[in-house]
């Protein structure tokens, strides 16, 4: 089957790039191909962090566990331990594998938005309720907590940023979380949309920077843009595009704040779910949207080594072949993507394709 066979090139990519890695002053960001979902492994010289643990189906579920297993086989110095696991929001495509990761590997710290609802509520509740007994430090964070007292610098602490590598220490900051009260201008529907309560995390490694916003949608995006527009809080070289490249998660005002050099989209193959009855698929959602690609195209200055022709959507179940020239990557096109970042702000991108 196609989904199973993709495990082989992903692992070959992992092993080939591993040959050049050691205890050096570099970080690696693994955008793991989990189909219509998201999971990103941050690898540092002295530790590892996982942001989200989604998977589209059982084959991708097993694939994520296999990928992490091979990672820890290579990084024996980490003793099968994730210094931190972050779940941006309680949807199953972002935490499907959370329970099995907790059973298979050691997790030192776990953070989320504190919600106990949504399609991924079982796994989120499990982690929240079992953390203390498993000796996992757990915290949840809200937008109000982060911005209290007019704070526009985000928040960080030893839970959010547990990595302390000699001469290669990242700075990890949280800029948004769940909204405790309905913001002005939000409808009740906006407030009940758990995507809008996604954690927003920025990782700065010397002169390199990465931004992760979960599935934050238009109202949530506008709230953080309004909050931080007078700062460089959201400015980042590498943007993980929100909500799998949906039309409602990337705006002009937002990209003006981020000014990305590279964009990465995590989504499934365009025809995943075509002909089936399951509506929670790439085909039914129509990810990524062509208008999102076009908007990114306006802001990203550099080009991929080679342009690619790939499928993107005008709407649900309406895909078309487009040419992608700019530094826009997607797990649907490139499968697992690994970005090597240096303290001096140099990036090297490796993909399965």
What are these model-derived regions, one by one?
Residues 97-101, 125-126, 223-227, 250-258:
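A short acidic, amphipathic alpha-helical/loop segment
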Residues 10-19:
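Hydrophobic h-region of N-terminal signal peptides that target proteins for export
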Residues 36-38, 57-58, 90-96, 116-120, ...:
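Active-site environment of divalent metal-dependent phosphoester hydrolases
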């Amino acid at each position: 089957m196609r989904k199973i066979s993709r495990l082989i090139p992903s692992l070959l990519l992992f092993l080939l790039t591993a040959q050049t890695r050691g205890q050096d002053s570099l970080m690696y960001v693994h955008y793991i191909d989990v189909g219509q979902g998201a999971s990103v492994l941050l690898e540092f010289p002295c530790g590892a962090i996982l942001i989200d643990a989604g998977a589209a189906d059982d084959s991708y579920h097993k694939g994520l566990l296999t990928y992490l297993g091979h990672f820890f086989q290579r990084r024996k110095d980490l003793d099968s331990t994730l210094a931190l696991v972050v779940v941006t929001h309680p949807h199953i495509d972002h935490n499907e594998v959370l329970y099995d990761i907790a059973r298979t590997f050691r997790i030192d710290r776990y953070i989320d938005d504190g919600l106990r609802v949504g399609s991924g509520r079982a796994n989120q509740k499990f982690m929240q309720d079992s953390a203390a007994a498993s000796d996992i430090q757990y915290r949840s964070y809200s937008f109000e907590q982060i911005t209290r007292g007019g704070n526009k610098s985000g928040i960080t602490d030893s839970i959010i940023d547990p990595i302390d590598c000699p001469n290669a220490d990242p700075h990890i900051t949280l800029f948004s979380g769940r909204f405790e009260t309905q913001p002005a201008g939000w409808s009740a529907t906006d407030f009940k949309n758990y995507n809008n309560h996604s954690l927003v995390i920025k990782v700065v490694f010397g002169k390199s920077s990465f931004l992760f916003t979960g599935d934050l949608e238009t109202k949530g995006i506008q709230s953080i843009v309004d909050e931080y527009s007078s700062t460089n809080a959201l400015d980042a070289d590498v943007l993980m595009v929100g909500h799998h490249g949906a039309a409602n998660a990337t705006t002009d005002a937002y990209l003006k704040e981020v000014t990305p050099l590279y964009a990465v989209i995590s989504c499934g193959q365009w025809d995943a779910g075509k002909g089936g009855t399951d509506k929670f698929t790439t085909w039914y959602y129509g990810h990524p949207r062509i208008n999102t690609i076009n908007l990114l195209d306006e802001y990203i200055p550099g080009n991929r080594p080679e342009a690619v022709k790939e499928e993107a959507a005008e709407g649900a179940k309406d895909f078309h072949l487009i040419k992608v020239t700019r530094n826009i990557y997607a797990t649907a096109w490139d499968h697992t993507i690994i970005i090597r970042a240096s303290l001096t702000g140099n990036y090297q991108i490796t993909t399965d394709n």
